[in-house]
UniProtKB/Swiss-Prot annotation:
PROSITE patterns: COMPLEX1_20K. NDH-1 shuttles electrons from an unknown electron donor, via FMN and iron-sulfur (Fe-S) centers, to quinones in the respiratory and/or the photosynthetic chain. The immediate electron acceptor for the enzyme in this species is believed to be plastoquinone. Couples the redox reaction to proton translocation, and thus conserves the redox energy in a proton gradient. Cyanobacterial NDH-1 also plays a role in inorganic carbon-concentration. Its cofactor is [4Fe-4S] cluster. Pfam families: Oxidored_q6 (PF01058). It catalyses: a plastoquinone + NADH + (n+1) H(+)(in) = a plastoquinol + NAD(+) + n H(+)(out); a plastoquinone + NADPH + (n+1) H(+)(in) = a plastoquinol + NADP(+) + n H(+)(out). The gene is ndhK. Its EC number is 7.1.1.-. This is NAD(P)H-quinone oxidoreductase subunit K. [4Fe-4S] cluster binds at C59, C60, C124, C155. Binds 1 [4Fe-4S] cluster. Keywords: 4Fe-4S, Iron, Iron-sulfur, Membrane, Metal-binding, NAD, NADP, Plastoquinone, Quinone, Thylakoid, Translocase, Transport.
Amino acid sequence: MVMNPTSFEQQQTEKLLNPMGRSQVTQDLSENVILTTVDDLYNWARLSSLWPLLYGTACCFIEFAALLGSRFDFDRFGLVPRSSPRQADLILVAGTVTMKMAPALVRLYEEMPEPKYVIAMGACTITGGMFSSDSTTAVRGVDKLIPVDLYIPGCPPRPEAIIDAIIKLRKKVSNETIQERSLKTEQTHRYYSTAHSMKVVEPILTGKYLGMDTWNNPPKELTEAMGMPVPPALLTAKQREEA
């Protein structure tokens, strides 16, 4: 067997000029080896095993509990409900948060290990909902207590909306890097609300209508329009004079 000296010299020259040349990957190797980065591998492991903390204070939690059933099956996302904050990395606040419950919520959040995420579910959690106008104990937004990553509006939101929020949270986790987490202990792109500019209005249920004349006696215009004479026993002194 005689080798071509010209081709051999070209190969040696190519090795000297480009010693780190790209090696040829065989077909079998390309089908059995996955190339990735440490960030992608780490984020894939975290987004595939989000463990939510069971925390519900009102009717919104019933919709979250529906995810545990076979119809929605949120186990396919790797979600495993936990009862201890030390084993959870996601807290889904579902329901009204009161002033008395606020310190307990903050304590649960602080006991969760980093990195941790928060989802605010329902109108009562986000803004106070139906209790935002006249309640003296409801917190007007859970983002006044802890930072929130995602909001799920609704009263209450359907389980499909919760699944959509989980998918968006998984996308957020997949875009994080280890360098950002090592430089900053606090997570970025989280939301704290500002003070609400609420106006004080006169209460509606004051009880003053009980003392009005029309409460016991219909007005004269109404009786004339309906053609129903009022019995004399029900007439007041002023109405008797007018009659």
